[in-house]
Amino acid sequence: MSLSFCGNNISSYNIYHGVLQNPCFVDALNLVPHVFLLFITFPILFIGWGSQSSKVQIHHNTWLHFPGHNLRWILTFALLFVHVCEIAEGIVSDSQRASRHLHLFMPAVMGFVATTTSIVYYHNIETSNFPKLLLALFLYWVMAFITKTIKLVKYWQLGWGMSDLRFCITGVMVILNGLLMAVEINVIRVRRYVFFMNPQKVKPPEDLQDLGVRFLQPFVNLLSKATYWWMNTLIISAHRKPIDLKAIGKLPIAMRAVTNYVCLKEAYEEQKKKAADHPNRTPSIWLAMYRAFGRPILLSSTFRYLADLLGFAGPLCISGIVQRVNEPKNNTTRFSETLSSKEFLENAHVLAVLLFLALILQRTFLQASYYVTIETGINLRGALLAMIYNKILRLSTSNLSMGEMTLGQINNLVAIETNQLMWFLFLCPNLWAMPVQIIMGVILLYNLLGSSALVGAAVIVLLAPIQYFIATKLAEAQKSTLDYSTERLKKTNEILKGIKLLKLYAWEHIFCKSVEETRMKELSSLKTFALYTSLSIFMNAAIPIAAVLATFVTHAYASGNNLKPAEAFASLSLFHILVTPLFLLSTVVRFAVKAIISVQKLNEFLLSDEIGEDSWRTGEGTLPFESCKKHTGVQSKPINRKQPGRYHLDNYEQARRLRPAETEDVAIKVTNGYFSWGSGLATLSNIDIRIPTGQLTMIVGQVGCGKSSLLLAILGEMQTLEGKVYWNNVNESEPSFEATRSRSRYSVAYAAQKPWLLNATVEENITFGSSFNRQRYKAVTDACSLQPDIDLLPFGDQTEIGERGINLSGGQRQRICVARALYQNTNIVFLDDPFSALDIHLSDHLMQEGILKFLQDDKRTVVLVTHKLQYLTHADWIIAMKDGSVLREGTLKDIQTKDVELYEHWKTLMNRQDQELEKDMEADQTTLERKTLRRAMYSREAKAQMEDEDEEEEEEEDEDDNMSTVMRLRTKMPWKTCWWYLTSGGFFLLFLMIFSKLLKHSVIVAIDYWLATWTSEYSINDPGKADQTFYVAGFSILCGAGIFLCLVTSLTVEWMGLTAAKNLHHNLLNKIILGPIRFFDTTPLGLILNRFSADTNIIDQHIPPTLESLTRSTLLCLSAIGMISYATPVFLIALAPLGVAFYFIQKYFRVASKDLQELDDSTQLPLLCHFSETAEGLTTIRAFRHETRFKQRMLELTDTNNIAYLFLSAANRWLEVRTDYLGACIVLTASIASISGSSNSGLVGLGLLYALTITNYLNWVVRNLADLEVQMGAVKKVNSFLTMESENYEGTMDPSQVPEHWPQEGEIKIHDLCVRYENNLKPVLKHVKAYIKPGQKVGICGRTGSGKSSLSLAFFRMVDIFDGKIVIDGIDISKLPLHTLRSRLSIILQDPILFSGSIRFNLDPECKCTDDRLWEALEIAQLKNMVKSLPGGLDATVTEGGENFSVGQRQLFCLARAFVRKSSILIMDEATASIDMATENILQKVVMTAFADRTVVTIAHRVSSIMDAGLVLVFSEGILVECDTGPNLLQHKNGLFSTLVMTNK
């Protein structure tokens, strides 16, 4: 065919009747605007434009949008689509002519290029903010509009109309060019860049003036929005450097929690006003959410409708293409000047291109719908969290204290209910999109197959409710699993906390068995869960097969015609479309029900009682300054700062005379006060008190008399039934601690009775938002005796404490809370029983240095609630409480004069406290606390050191490697871990899973191939009605086999996952429980517990479905590629570049997704912790009036979590858009190849069907790969513990060789003993030699770290004995099996450990002893009467950790436990360190009598306790330096023992 612009006919070039009368020259005229634009713009684009000064200097170049920006992009895309149609129409028309007529499509091609150039040119001009250069575009649109109008008029003159496609295309282009011209005119009008002296200046949006904003979706152009092109930089950079919070920056203002909170709050307040007019109505949160977030949901729904409608283009185009391929080739070419729309759409190539464009648009709209709903859901969640937090800060204290609103309920609202509503919003568009999709699908099926299609639709509709039933059962099974999992974790936690005792008593197997029993119950529930999960997967796969089988079999026998390929494969595609919404229906309904329940809970919470607006909060109702100047009877005296630690009322007069004169003002006054906790009954009644300004007021009384309630009532935490609380104005001119300091008018510092700490550093807990002043900070820490404790912490006062940090003792926590109150720059300080958790030394120091010196010298008003009556001598004012009322108020002298009985009662109580003081002086609690903290720090430092060394090694390796190596490591899938997980499920199940999966997908491919053969056979060879029994039978058998294999594969995967989970947990538990004690010393408890909780949960419930989905989607994609290649081998040529593109997409996405997932997870915990710690410390926060600061912190944490989740969602959209576009390219390639190279219509239909399938599953392959990579991290963590070396439980002696009653005598010989904790550590005992006679009482002492406890551990082989030996009753303990050795000895540890269960279980977990023996042990331990008084006696309940017993009782239970064993050797490892003297005396007495004939080795906490021992061993730095009786050692005045005795006096 010859090539020419107007064809070979000479008349085509005739312009005799005028140029415009020649169609070819009119088409040539249309080239002029395009050539003009290309000629003008290309030099500007490639050479550069404008001066640099005209460009906006900002880090984001996408912010500037000229007027009509989005409209321009939409119109340009529409114009490009019309140009494609024009090109296609021209090519199809040209193909019907004898010679080539370039004018039919060449102008359209140039138009397409010019339009593309126009939008590129516009984008560059826009980002450079140089609008003057847009004049070229204005001229282009004017010229294009004119030329297209001339062409349209010419067609109209020829008599063409709406039935002619070319006329329609030209008309649409005239409209589009005209609209684009109008857009340019509007830009000129608004920006005033042409013919105006002062062009408009444009400022960047407020968001992008902040360099921290990195989320650019709202600011980029439409193309970048649709394709998430702006995400490329972040996702690609993840290979070089992990994505951190700095990389993702901050949220734009419109997406921040505070912005959405204001929006939702206004809508909710409007609903509250409407509800106020109707008493029985509550404000509707649903309507509030609709008002606030309805618009984006409607936009998302519109996108969804468009996507769903475009989704039906696939089946229709498949039908059209297969029909065209099936038609016999007609060699006679019918010439026509123009094509109709019907003729145009009958062209197979046109249909292929339209299918490609429809897929692109469908997937773009679908991802846009997903993004808008996710963004709206995130915004809703942020707003709800802010609303909940705002309510928490105003929540009535009685709601929390009286149990109406628990901390768990608040945490559920935050962690569960808000997420339920967010997920419901994600699924919302499905509610109204699904009915349209189902109706459209059924109508199209009916048009294709007639009434037989209704049979298949009926099968789907009837079977779909089963999915809802399965989903309900899944939820029940999950709840049951959670309950068992909680119980298992509780037991595991107990094991880990008491692991030292379990090992020493050789009880590991008993407790391990208990955990295994609970695990079996959990696994039973997991089996149910796995079964229903398998059924759900089975239903998803089997229902489409069943529907297709029913439809085609019905059609084969009920219809009068054979099944054609076009009908068959279009129907298959429609069935896949129809099944999806019906399956989603159950999920949407389930989430809708959950959302309704969540809204009910949220509404109840938001309508719950709030705290009253008291005068001290609002600044109103204050007591006039003048009326406060009433004499309070207080006489001023100086303080004796060097007063001893005992206080007597007899010294009162002397103490009072020493206090300087102070102001007589009243700081707080309560008149006729009646206060309640919300029940309506007054907890405090008839309260008339006054608190003098600048003085120390003490509130005293019996436990439960209302002292703490009085403080809280003054703070406004209680409900005021009657009366008033007045707060005095503050005299700002008073001298203060700092000359430059100014105090808040109603500022209060408050230390609660129950210490409350933030999850923050020690410094942040003390300063509590106030500016840091080093001098003041040091004074406070010294006053609270905190510096020695801070010095023990690994990072000093920068160490994080609280839930996520170091666990401090009660006393240490209490002192930090008191330090916080002291540090604050407030006029008034409330201290609620600050001495309760402190020993006498600390209490005395805090009273002297903290309260009397630091606070009183600063003339601050101090209100102190205390039981320590010995401090009453320092009180300026005393309030005595009894049964919720004020018993007495006044100075101590007033009370002594007016109420002698009360005064004498106080003196009696003080004498008792003095007696207890003598005992407490010996039982130094602070020393014990610091020792415990030191041990914890040692363990953490050791672990941290190991981790630091590992990190340093990794860093060195990373530095040595080049960038490509780092990228390779970041992108590498953990295949080794995957294989290890798969083999944990058993090789048989692994083989069965692989085999069944391959067989199932082979059968599914066979079903489709059989259908292709069936339809092709009868459509070609026998167009009439034929006997189809053979094909129907074969099709039915294959479908039945496919359904059966769907069930087998789903069950196999779940069962393999369950088996792997069972084996991994079993191995982990046994490895941990048999691990060396050193492992538990150096590994934080939370880290080990995390393996049994979060990691085990991932292995149990998350990996199996991910693995199933990954294998299914991968095999579907591979089978699709295989079938397409089989149908059209030419496709393989295009497969290579598509495969390369897919490889790089998944490679970059997996790394970025993993980082963003970790960021999302890591930012959730601080947010949840902030909510829980706010609820716990509500009274303190409100007392300090720090609500605003805490709100701001909550908003920051919410935004941080939201930005991480938003980026993760955007990354998922980035992936799905690209894989969807790749899928569309595969469809286009397959279509073109099928049309050009295949004459078998069945295979063409099959190839196109599988090509459409790929678009659905490509992104799932990558998503599942990314998820599996993250989840395999849990397996890797578990595996890291499984490689740990266990203790060597075997010995050279067989257990049967050990005498039954060994050790019977209790003789111990220590020969040159050397001990260390690990091979790479220094010895802790060096060449120790000692001999202990049978039945001898031995005392071991030494300074901290001298090796005392190490020796006790050596008896049980808990440490590495690398030299020397210990011989007990003639047997070297190194030869004994560990279980035998440990089961024959007894030990009582410093920390008394009891386990949850019964008293019987704690004494005899092996159930070997009779009740008489147990009662005998309890009687010896002085516990028999107490246990008898308990309900159940020996079977009485022991709570976790034995918390329902005192520390002393717990230690006595441990003694009884040791006696039950009746070992001839008892070791007491500082067993009396944590108990008082009275309990210690009982313990020593019992040991001397009950163990009179046994060997007792006592490691002394107090040297005085071993003075009467038959032998005393004194250690120093791991060496035995002294060995003799106590009296003999005391004779050596310079000896270590003598020094220790003198020190402890």
UniProtKB/Swiss-Prot annotation:
Gene Ontology molecular functions: ABC-type transporter activity; ATP binding; ATP hydrolysis activity; ATPase-coupled monoatomic cation transmembrane transporter activity; ATPase-coupled transmembrane transporter activity; heterocyclic compound binding; identical protein binding; potassium channel activator activity
Biased composition (Acidic residues): 947-962
Membrane topology annotation: Multi-pass membrane protein
SMART domains from the UniProt entry: AAA (SM00382)
Positions bound to ATP 2: 1342-1349
Tissue: Expressed at high levels in heart, skeletal muscle and ovary. Moderate levels are found in brain, tongue and pancreatic islets. Low levels are found in lung, testis and adrenal gland. Expressed at very low levels in stomach, colon, thyroid and pituitary.
Location in or out of the cell: Membrane
Start and end residues of each ABC transporter domain: 668-908, 1308-1542
Coiled coil: none
Disulfide bond positions: none
Annotated Gene Ontology cellular component terms: acrosomal vesicle; cytoplasm; inward rectifying potassium channel; membrane; mitochondrion; plasma membrane; protein-containing complex; sarcolemma
Glycosylation sites: 9, 330-331
TM helices/strands, residue ranges: 31-51, 73-93, 102-122, 133-153, 168-188, 302-322, 348-368, 421-441, 453-473, 529-549, 569-589, 987-1007, 1031-1051, 1124-1144, 1242-1262
Family note: Belongs to the ABC transporter superfamily. ABCC family. Conjugate transporter (TC 3.A.1.208) subfamily.
Quaternary structure, from the entry: Interacts with KCNJ11. Interacts with KCNJ8.
Protein name, as recorded: ATP-binding cassette sub-family C member 9
The species this protein was found in: Rattus norvegicus
